[in-house]
Structure formats: structure tokens, C-alpha cells
A protein has these predicted regions:
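Active-site donor-nucleotide binding/catalytic segment of nucleotide-sugar enzymes
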Residues: 168-201, 218-224, 328
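Short, basic/hydrophobic alpha-helical segments
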Residues: 199-215
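Donor-binding and catalytic core of enzymes assembling or modifying cell-surface/extracellular glycoconjugates
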Residues: 214-288
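Catalytic binding pocket for nucleotide-activated donors in carbohydrate/polymer assembly enzymes
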Residues: 274-329, 351
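Alpha-helical protein-protein interaction scaffolds
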Residues: 316-387
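A donor-sugar binding/catalytic signature common to diverse glycosyltransferases
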Residues: 11-15, 21-29, 43-45, 256-301
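Secretory-pathway glycan-assembly enzymes, especially type II membrane glycosyltransferases
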Residues: 3-184, 188
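Short, aromatic/basic amphipathic alpha-helical patches
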Residues: 50-63, 227-236, 377-378
Length: 387
């Protein structure tokens, strides 16, 4: 490892493009504020969704990351990239929430080289990081990144598309990905990840009832099939980001980059709970960030999904996810256990590979002290070896 008198703040996430770039920008920000040396680690990665759907044009795999040489200029890599530091999928500063960012200067450091960066909005963590100044410095840092010639070309193409909308546009980011389509993502529904995605049924109603006065709406989604169904449901009055692609043969990272640049030019960005894709667009632009789960009440979201759950002809996985969100809203609003169970049963009918519906049913039976029914389901699971 290179030796520096100043300590290192390193960006070394190992997940999706958006999260990696958010972490990289945060590392650049911290280096400026605390006079640390900035560095990054970038390992290529192929997402399993890519293998599953590589012969189709149905899904954009935002977790598929190509080599650093295809994204960044060689000068940027030579100056800031580290091969000797391992990549890491998760790192957070939330243990420092409410404290000053200058606490990072206190010894001992987290690692011998200094600190790892995180991908989150630092203005929601550190008490003295003010959003306006923070985002201004993030944009400055973004402009300092030396991208490859190809990625600079893609950036210019996205900016051209944005200029086509003289009156501006509103962006809606519908995140699905591994949360909705991958078996490994299902178990996380019981924790934080259910809110990381967003239901197409919910978005359809938001457009129909709350954004019907907006002239230009662009949908950004990793599920292209569902996006087309949504557009038809909205009488073709919305645009899909994929319609503006400068090259239909772009790689996943190239397409992600194009869409993030375009999204960053929106006046407002409606997004799910915590997606790196839309967060990065907010980091590098001046858009108003609107989290759907915070902007609308639980009862509104609940009714939004119910409004078209039988009309919107989505895939079974998407419909199962919508039913699970109905279950979550019903539980949080303390609706009857019978109603909660109804949504779980409907969701399981749509996707019997997703055992989260069964686990949630068991939880309800335990809460009702119906141990006999809970044990019966558990025995069936063990007998069938379904877990």
C-alpha cells in the first residue's frame, strides 16, 4: 500500500453501481473536509440476475459491475485506486449518528490506513454536515471524477435528452431487482429491504391520482416488462427512460450511468426507501428528493395498491411483492389478523417459492397463541424440506 502522511478515506463497497458511486463521492467529500487522502477499490462483479435473464431484455441488473478501466480514466485509476485493500459490501457511520464528522479524525482510526467510507447521506448522520453545503460539495466532487471517454460520451447523450424537456420533467424510480426477483432477496423482506423496492401498483395510483397534472413523467426501473405494462395502464402518457437510450446495446453499467445522469436532471425524484440508484442521482443534481414511503401516509399507500391490484397485469413476483406490502401496511395500521393473513395467502398463491409468506403466517399464529396451527405448518415445512 502507498504510504501517506495523511490518513486514507477509502471507498471499497462491493455491491451495486449506485451504492459504490455514492460511497466514492462521500469519500471524496470527507477527504476535502478532514484533509484525508481519498482512495477507492473497484472489483468487477457479475450479478446472478444477469445469468438468469441474459438472453432477454427484461431486467436491468444494476448490481453487475464492470472493470474500473471501462468506467474511469487511467489517470484517475493510477492516482486513487488501491489493489491491496479488500472490497467490502457493507460499512456504515450510523454508530456515529448525531456526532460531529470531525470525530473521524480521532485516534485510533478504524483501520491502520484510516477509515472506510459509506454510501448513506452524511447530512442525516453527522450533526455538522448541512445538506445544502454537503450536496454542493458532492456535485463539485462529481465534476472532478475523470471518467473514461466512453462514459463521458454517455453523460453527454443523457444531458442532451434532458434538454429536450424544456419545461422539465419529474422522475419516478421504481426499484425491483434482487428484492423482488431473487430467492436470496426474499428473506430480507422481513428486515429492511421490503422498503428498498417499491410496488408498481402503488406507483400506478400515485401517477393516476397525485401526479396527473404533471406533463412530463419519466419512469426509471430495472424491470422493463413491468414498466411497459405501467405505461399502457397510464394510456401512454408517461415516458420510459429506456426509450431515450443512445445505444440499445449498452452494458448494464453503461445503461445505469445513462439513466442516473438523466434522472439527476429531474425537477423532482420520487423514489423508494433507500436505493443507491436514486440517491446518487440526488447527490449529483439539484432535484428535490421525495421518498414515497414518507411523502404518503400508510393508509394512502395501502389504498393505492388495492386500487389496481387486480387490474395491473404484472408478473407473479411483482404481484407477490405488492401483496406483501399490503400485509406490512395492514400490520402497521393494526388491521385485523384475518386481513393480514388474507394478503399473505394471496401473495403465496402468486409465488410459492417465497417462503417469507409462510414464515409471516407462522408469526401471526404465534401472536394469536394458536400454537397447534403454527406447529402444524412448521412440521409440514420440515417434512417437505422446504428451507
Amino acid at each position: 500500500m502507498k504510504k501517506y502522511k495523511r490518513k486514507l478515506i477509502i471507498s471499497n463497497r462491493d455491491d451495486g453501481f449506485g451504492e459504490r458511486m455514492c460511497s466514492l463521492l462521500n469519500a471524496m467529500y470527507i477527504s476535502k473536509i478532514l484533509n484525508f487522502h481519498f482512495g477507492f477499490v473497484w472489483k468487477n462483479k457479475v450479478d446472478s440476475l444477469l445469468y438468469q435473464y441474459k438472453k432477454t431484455d427484461r431486467y436491468l441488473c444494476c448490481n453487475d459491475c464492470i472493470d474500473k478501466e471501462e468506467i474511469f480514466h487511467s489517470d484517475f485509476i493510477k492516482k486513487f485506486h488501491y489493489d491491496t485493500i479488500p472490497s467490502s459490501i457493507i460499512h456504515s457511520f450510523f454508530k456515529m449518528k448525531g456526532k460531529s464528522i470531525y470525530i473521524l479524525k480521532n485516534k485510533p482510526y478504524e483501520y491502520s490506513f484510516g477509515h472506510q467510507s459509506c454510501q448513506e447521506d452524511l447530512s442525516t448522520i453527522f450533526s455538522d454536515v448541512k445538506e445544502r453545503q454537503y450536496r454542493k460539495l458532492l456535485r463539485k466532487s462529481w465534476n472532478e471524477i475523470q471518467f473514461s471517454l466512453n462514459f463521458r460520451h454517455i453523460m453527454l447523450e443523457a444531458e442532451k435528452v434532458a434538454k429536450m424537456f424544456e419545461k422539465g420533467f419529474v422522475a419516478i424510480h421504481i426499484r425491483s431487482g434482487d428484492i423482488v426477483f431473487e430467492f436470496k432477496g426474499y428473506s430480507r423482506w422481513l428486515m429492511f429491504s421490503a422498503y428498498k423496492a417499491v410496488s408498481f401498483n402503488l406507483i400506478a395510483s400515485v401517477i393516476k391520482y397525485k401526479l396527473n397534472y404533471i406533463e412530463n413523467i419519466i419512469i426509471f426501473s430495472d424491470d422493463t416488462d413491468s414498466s411497459k405494462i405501467l405505461k399502457k395502464y397510464c394510456d401512454n402518457k408517461i415516458f420510459l427512460a429506456e426509450e431515450f437510450l443512445c445505444d440499445k446495446h449498452l452494458s448494464n453499467d453503461e445503461r445505469s450511468f445513462f439513466e442516473i445522469i438523466l434522472m439527476s436532471k429531474a425537477q423532482e425524484i420520487y423514489h423508494s426507501g433507500n436505493s443507491g440508484f436514486s440517491r446518487l442521482a440526488c447527490f449529483i443534481g439539484v432535484s428535490r428528493s421525495i421518498c414515497i414511503y414518507k411523502y404518503f401516509s400508510k393508509i394512502q399507500q395501502y389504498n393505492f395498491i388495492l386500487d389496481n391490484i387486480d387490474e395491473l397485469r404484472l408478473s407473479r413476483q411483482q404481484k407477490a411483492y405488492s401483496y406483501f406490502m399490503l400485509f406490512i401496511f395492514a400490520r402497521e395500521m393494526k388491521l385485523s389478523k384475518k386481513k393480514q393473513m388474507f394478503f399473505l395467502e394471496k401473495g403465496y398463491e402468486e409465488d410459492k417459492n417465497n417462503k417469507v409468506f409462510i414464515l409471516s403466517q407462522i408469526e401471526i399464529y404465534f401472536s394469536l397463541c394458536d400454537y397447534e396451527k403454527a406447529n402444524q405448518i412448521i412440521k409440514e415445512i420440515v417434512y417437505k424440506n422446504e428451507f
